[in-house]
Amino acid sequence: MKLSLLASVALVPFVSAHYFFDVLVIDGKETRSNEFVRSNTRPAKYNPTKWKNIRDDMTPDMPDFRCNKGAFTFAGQTGTAEVKAGSKLAMKLAVGATMQHPGPALVYMSKAPSSAKTYEGDGDWFKIHEEGVCNKNADFTKDAWCTWDKDRIEFTIPADLPDGEYLIRPEHIGLHGAHDGQAEFYYTCAQVKVVGGGTGTPGPTIKFPGGYKKDDPSFNFSLWNGYKDYPMPGPTVWTGGSGSGSSSYSKVANVTSSDESSQSGASSSQGTVSTCPNKYNRRHARQFKP
């Protein structure tokens, strides 16, 4: 036990440069590590997925890009959390890490045909949340981004979402190397059963793999020459009601705050904009160089 704790503590500096999600938070209550979140089989669980300088023989063009490498092998032993439509959730990073790469966060969902435990994620995915830049007057390579130094992605289950079992796929994209084709993807899947929902038709939808392309501007974006609007990847956020079919790419979105406020938000979940102050105590890590 003591050795395991020491190993976890030793990981903290590194995984704040590289990291992974392992805890589902439901209405402010943290669940156990991997209780409802699928693990993966990567030798180093915190390694990102990339198109260039590939790690663990894993790219965004592979089926495992849905939930991470080998994640489906853990599906049967992973629990399925019951959550109410309209409830506030979060996906938290493991071992005290924080997101210390500049870039956006997105959250997707996909409905299982029956049980989430037997679903590989090969169906349609729709986006329920995204957040980009919260303060365009801050350092565009660091704390201009809403996710900077946070330990979780917070989002809301759409109130109009039909009941059923779903996969939730949180994703953080590190853009520090995107100018060189080295965008880094950090993601996983949680298993949930939605209750008390509505009759909406989620959309637009994409597939994983296939929804992201190597030459998409979102993944070849340079943040090293000052602020510029960032083109959000994927479809637009579903806010309830009827979706609009499939989509392979979203519109170019201005996701910045206003000039008047350094803390105005750019977080979109169910069509709302919220502030994103740093609310949690963080452990800082050494600077990562790609």
Swiss-Prot record:
Q: Which GO terms describe its biological process?
A: cellulose catabolic process
Query: How is the cofactor bound, in the record's words?
Result: Binds 1 copper ion per subunit.
The relationship between pH and activity is given as:
Optimum pH is 8.0.
Q: Which gene encodes it?
A: AA9A
- Give the start-end ranges of region Disordered: 240-290
* Record-given protein name: AA9 family lytic polysaccharide monooxygenase A
Question: Which is a Gene Ontology cellular component entry for this protein?
Answer: extracellular region
Which reaction(s) are listed as its catalytic activity? [(1->4)-beta-D-glucosyl]n+m + reduced acceptor + O2 = 4-dehydro-beta-D-glucosyl-[(1->4)-beta-D-glucosyl]n-1 + [(1->4)-beta-D-glucosyl]m + acceptor + H2O
Q: What does this protein do?
A: Lytic polysaccharide monooxygenase (LPMO) that depolymerizes crystalline and amorphous polysaccharides via the oxidation of scissile alpha- or beta-(1-4)-glycosidic bonds, yielding exclusively C1 oxidation products. Catalysis by LPMOs requires the reduction of the active-site copper from Cu(II) to Cu(I) by a reducing agent and H(2)O(2) or O(2) as a cosubstrate.
Q: Where is the composition biased (Low complexity)?
A: 245-275
Cystine bridges: C67-C189
